[in-house]
């Protein structure tokens, strides 16, 4: 089972959404941020299931989304660039369903 510590190790913060009352994980970038949920829009807890990453600008306007096959696929992308770097944001954007 995935925990906040697993996500923190690869640079993600943890937050609770007041509307849905679920835990999401996210990462901040310059003028943008991304969030992670499972495919049902809930807290990701199963390392073998797909995860949805959604990107937003500073005004919380939706930019794009990607699907990661599983937690390992997300970890592999995170190892390619520093957390919160522009390079990592571009890698996330280009990494749909890998």
Positions of predicted regions on the chain:
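Short, flexible coil/linker elements and helix-boundary hinge sites characteristic
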Residues: 11, 25, 41, 81-82
